[in-house]
Amino acid sequence: MAFVTRCLILAAGRFDPVTLARAALSDREPRLDVFELACALSADVLDFQDVDAARSPLVRATHRALGPSAALALLGAERAARYDAILTTGEDIGIPLAARLRLVRDRPSHTMIAHTLFPVKKRIFFSVGRVDGCIDRFLCYATSEERNLVERLSVPAGRVQRIAYHADQRFFRPFEAPPEPDLICSAGQLLRDYPTLIEAVRGAPIRLRIAAGSPWIAADLKPGTPLPSNVEWGKYSRFDLRALYARSAVCVVPIQENDYQTGISTILEMMAMGKCVIATRTRGQTDTLVDGVNGIYVPPGDPAALRAAIVRALDRPEETARIGAAARRYIEENATLDLFVERVAAATLGSPAKDEAPRLAQ
């Protein structure tokens, strides 16, 4: 009889699988990676809803004192004996789980997706708590994070794997209708540099639509100053956001300088739509776009450079279309949701991912 690996996924968030599946089937929402992974691994999933429903006094106390991520880690640790492998979707869950697994003699394997371990409050768990001893595989999305893990946190390189993040290539896909030639758009919330983008289009014959929001951030992001007449700011559903991408001649992702791969979800969604993406090249955002090939990079906080890049892209629609087509090819070859699921599932089961993210920008 073949051995079956019993897997558990600990996922940040509150998910309704039935509603999300219906929305994806009706082409109203992209597929959710957590549930695609659960299907691929035949895994159980615990999320914040399970924390809310937990009867364990310790889990409830942890939730009150430290928040839902730490409580979810504790809930996973309480059930660890039922599983051979655990996947945590971020260090907010993975670090406290690893700390708790240090007390378990016969623990399951633990694969953790590491988003950003640069902050001191996270690094201290490696230097003092040595939680890395209970994390068998680290998956990261950026070269900056890969180097941080190996060079700064002293995690053995063989336990660190950089993979491409993803967009659902079925939902985010090129539309046949031509874009509106004077329309550009931007989207997202975390560490966005919208003031620089707004200044870049001020007074220009360009319409800018900003979809300021994130599925993972509850608080609304509001403009800090009055907007020029050619700029509109609002929140969009995923369905309406896709329509905005499709209508736009160029897509822009302005980012504040940082070490994290901020904006990658938005960039990949736009690329999957076959769009020419202009993005800020930060310390953490270096791995996906190849300047002039499948996207355009601009320096941080430079409205003049950003304006020049936007105007050039709008004035040269054939070049913009070429870059957009290359962007879609990049997604299909490297960053689809299906490839992401294959890689993460393989890592969780203890084997190397089939096609590690290519280091195109190096």
Task: Give residue spans per PLM region.
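Conserved donor-binding/catalytic loop of nucleotide-activated donor transferases
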Residues: A246-S248, T266-C276, T280-R281, D291, ...
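A short, well-ordered alpha-helix in the C-terminal region of glycosyltransferases
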Residues: R312, E319-E333, F340-A346
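Nucleotide-activated donor-binding/catalytic signature segment of Leloir-type glycosyltransferases, i.e.
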Residues: A212, A219-Y245
